[in-house]
């Protein structure tokens, strides 16, 4: 469910309130100020949709998702992912910003822990961009420009959205 127009703390409080009643609802993606995705069991999300609106959300809308990502419902998948990553990763890393901590990591052990946690913890997207903006000249998104739109609300740094090989080649000419 995407919730628009509420502060992070209000969304978190509603999730805690739901959890205290045995419901499985979790803040899952902190996209930008006033936009949080909430994950959980669909019946639980549906039950609390109206409460988000009552507490001031401009919009609370169920998303067509096949899995409740970035929340404790994926605990078993997280453990399985850890086992697969153990043999897939090596020790050589360029710094990568973790969506779990919004900070860089550079080692295999950090990668293993943080990538497993990424399945069961919220995505700190806006915090990741805010924390990294001073060390980059621009951001590059490969895809449909969803993140470029969010970045406009988070940082003054430009974000380039690349959705084709031709766009990638053109971008590389410009940045050389």
Predicted regions and their residues:
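Alpha/beta catalytic cores of group-transfer enzymes, especially the acyltransferase/condensing modules
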Residues: 1-118
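Acyltransferase/transacylase module recognition
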Residues: 89-176
């Amino acid at each position: 469910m995407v919730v628009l127009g509420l502060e992070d703390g209000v969304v978190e409080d509603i999730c805690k309130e739901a959890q205290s009643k045995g419901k499985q609802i979790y803040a899952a993606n902190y996209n930008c100020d006033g936009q949080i995705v909430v994950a959980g069991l669909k019946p639980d999300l549906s039950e609390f949709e109206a409460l988000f609106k009552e507490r001031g959300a401009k919009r609370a809308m169920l998303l067509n998702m096949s899995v409740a990502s970035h929340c404790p419902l994926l605990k078993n998948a997280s453990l399985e992912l850890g086992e697969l990553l153990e043999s897939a990763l090596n020790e050589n890393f360029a710094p990568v910003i973790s969506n779990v901590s919004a900070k860089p990591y550079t080692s295999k052990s950090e990668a293993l822990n943080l990538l497993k946690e990424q399945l069961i913890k919220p995505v700190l997207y806006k915090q990741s961009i805010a924390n990294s903006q001073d060390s980059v000249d621009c951001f590059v998104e490969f895809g449909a420009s969803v993140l470029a739109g969010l970045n406009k609300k988070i940082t003054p740094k430009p974000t380039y959205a690349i959705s084709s090989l031709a766009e990638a080649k053109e971008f590389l000419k410009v940045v050389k």
